[in-house]
């Protein structure tokens, strides 16, 4: 409530007296110009009005100049933990938190004195931050700029790092080795980075790939110009050995990297192994380096805080990706047939390799699944073409799924190229006399004698050839039982061979009779050839008889064309 001051009361009394004087002087006509009181009263009233006007104006000015602003209050933001703690190689144990009222999430560094209050192990990385895991008891080391391996490269998606890969040598070309879940991520890859420099990625050709999480790899054909711009060199892939020391590399970018050390542990399956090297967020796909090269590629964790998992790229590139038909035996890997898979007591893992096909993996063996179906399996299919139908005794090909020419009737066009009526079904029986069987005419004795003489001449040449290396031995050795049996075995096939190679043919007629030998020529008998023993006395008598027959045959030459059944003597 407004309370006037004493000055206000004095002004009020003075203005009331001045108003009364002015009213008496000017209104009621009692004004005397010689008196000054009315003038003073009038001046008092004017000064009071002027003062009031000035006060109102000054109040208005002050009112306008006053600025009204909202009241300032203290805002309080509450953040809620939205993930399990994970270990960061730079900041230690970190938790992801989000504001209660909405907004961007932050990462909270946990005080080491509060680690024991966390519900789970602080040395883990769960699905929220990747498939990597730090190993309890292991440490991280800071890598100097340019001190990382020359083949290491980072895969970027904008300003975030999806993972790491390496340039490796494979069958005359350099390819980028990277996990499948990194290259085909929900966030598309945009660049390859190395030591603070990056090159945009394109739709490059893929040499081979596998989307199975247990065989998680991609081999990308990156142009040589990209490698040259990033100064990335290639390295070789080696087979892992149990207990080998391995080293991993990673970080939030390609310029500030960290590394971890561990050991490789072999498993029963040749395509995978475990290691104790620590990893962190964004390290997926980091190669496992040794002193001589790369022995594997990190793909995830097996036991949180204890071991990580890696794939054996040497087995994959040598057996599943390589185009070599044979494998070196020193590798210890064996390819088997698909039928042998069912004979094994252990299970096989079936995966599909892009640009290669399906393959079954079991321990240190693998078998390729053939493409398509076997011929025997195709016979059991129900999608075979429909056969023609029988309608009124005729085959109808209209509904059959086979190609045919409907304009040409079947079995009506002959080789002569003219239309011929089909044969009638009702044929007239015709009786005809049956010809008597023809009698076989025996071979003349002259032909038999001629063939026998030719055969004996061939056998004589053969015996002379066989007897030449035996002249150095005595008569006792010639008459031994072993030599007799040997000669019989050697002579018997020659006789059968001559008869089988030169079958008898009809002989042309001649104007003169053929006289080949004297009437004393013995008949055809296989006994001198294979059935009769050839002792020393028998050989001498047979040689004399053959010489006499040869002389007689030379004195009486055979006239006419020679018989094709008597071949020239064969040298053996």
Swiss-Prot record:
For bias type Basic residues, the affected ranges are 544-555
Which GO molecular function annotation, any one, does this entry have? serine-type endopeptidase activity
- Per the Swiss-Prot or TrEMBL record, the active site comprises 181, 216, 284
GO BP annotations listed: proteolysis; viral translational frameshifting
* Keywords, alphabetical: Covalent protein-RNA linkage, Host membrane, Hydrolase, Membrane, Protease, Serine protease, Transferase, Transmembrane, Transmembrane helix
Q: Which Pfam families match?
A: Peptidase_S39
Top enzyme class: hydrolase
| Gene3D superfamilies hit by this protein | Trypsin-like serine proteases (2.40.10.10)
E.C. designation(s): 3.4.21.-
List all Polar residues biased stretches. Answer: 508-520
**Region feature (Disordered):** 498-572
One cellular-component annotation, GO: membrane
Region forming the signal peptide: none
Sites marked Cleavage: 132-133, 325-326, 402-403, 499-500
Q: Fill in the PTM field for this protein.
A: The polyprotein is proteolytically cleaved into several chains by the viral protease.
Q: InterPro entries, from UniProt?
A: Peptidase_S1_PA, Peptidase_S1_PA_chymotrypsin, Peptidase_S39B_luteovirus
**What's the protein here called?**
Polyprotein P2A
Q: Which organism is it from?
A: Southern cowpea mosaic virus
């Amino acid at each position: 409530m407004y309370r006037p001051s004493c000055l206000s009361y004095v002004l009020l009394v003075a203005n009331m007296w001045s108003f009364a004087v002015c009213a008496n002087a000017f209104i009621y006509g009692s004004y005397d110009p010689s008196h000054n009181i009315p003038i003073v009263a009038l001046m008092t009233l004017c000064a009071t009005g002027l003062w009031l006007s000035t006060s109102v104006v000054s109040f208005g000015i002050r009112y306008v100049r006053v600025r009204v602003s909202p009241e300032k209050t203290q805002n309080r933001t509450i953040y809620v933990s939205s993930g399990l703690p994970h270990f960061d190689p730079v900041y230690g144990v970190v938790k992801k938190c989000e504001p209660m009222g909405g907004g961007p999430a932050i990462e909270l560094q946990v005080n080491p004195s509060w680690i024991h209050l966390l519900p789970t192990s602080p040395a883990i990385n769960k699905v929220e931050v990747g498939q990597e895991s730090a190993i309890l008891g292991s440490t991280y080391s800071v890598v100097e700029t340019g001190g990382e391996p020359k083949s290491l490269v980072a895969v970027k998606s904008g300003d975030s790092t999806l993972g790491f890969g390496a340039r490796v040598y494979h069958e005359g070309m350099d390819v980028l080795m990277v996990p499948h879940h990194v290259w085909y991520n929900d966030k598309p890859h945009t660049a390859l980075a190395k030591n603070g420099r990056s090159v945009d990625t394109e739709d490059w050709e893929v040499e081979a790939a596998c989307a199975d999480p247990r065989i998680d790899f991609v081999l990308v054909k990156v142009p040589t110009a990209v490698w040259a711009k990033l100064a990335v060199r290639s390295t070789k892939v080696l087979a892992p050995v149990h207990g080998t020391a391995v080293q991993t590399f990673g970080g939030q970018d390609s310029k500030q990297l960290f590394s971890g050390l561990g050991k490789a542990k072999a498993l029963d399956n040749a395509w995978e192994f475990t290691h104790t090297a620590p990893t962190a967020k964004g390290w997926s796909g980091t190669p496992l380096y040794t002193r001589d090269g790369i022995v594997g590629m990190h793909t995830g964790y097996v036991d949180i805080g204890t071991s990580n998992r890696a794939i054996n790229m040497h087995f994959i590139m040598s057996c599943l990706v390589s185009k070599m038909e044979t494998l070196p035996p020193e590798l210890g890997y064996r390819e088997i047939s698909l039928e042998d898979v069912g004979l094994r007591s252990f299970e096989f893992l079936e995966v599909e390799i892009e640009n290669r096909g399906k393959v079954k993996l079991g321990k240190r063996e693998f078998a390729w699944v053939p493409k398509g179906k076997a011929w025997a399996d195709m016979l059991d299919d129900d999608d075979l073409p429909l056969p023609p139908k029988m309608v009124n005794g005729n085959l109808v090909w209209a509904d059959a799924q086979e190609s045919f020419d409907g304009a040409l009737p079947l079995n009506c066009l002959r080789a002569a190229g003219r239309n011929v009526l089909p044969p009638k079904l009702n044929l007239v029986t015709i009786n005809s006399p049956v010809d008597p069987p023809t009698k076989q005419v025996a071979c003349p004795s002259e032909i038999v004698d001629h063939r026998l003489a030719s055969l004996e001449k061939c056998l004589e040449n053969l015996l002379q050839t066989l007897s030449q290396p035996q002249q150095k031995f005595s008569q006792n050795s010639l008459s031994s039982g072993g030599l007799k049996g040997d000669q019989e075995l050697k002579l018997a096939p020659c006789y059968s061979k001559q008869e089988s190679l030169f079958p008898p043919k009809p002989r042309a007629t001649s104007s003169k009779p053929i006289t080949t030998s004297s009437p004393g020529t013995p008949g055809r008998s296989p006994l001198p050839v294979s059935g009769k023993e050839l002792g020393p006395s028998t050989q001498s008598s047979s040689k004399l008889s053959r010489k006499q027959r040869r002389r007689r045959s030379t004195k009486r030459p055979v006239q006419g064309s020679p018989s094709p059944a008597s071949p020239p003597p064969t040298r053996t």
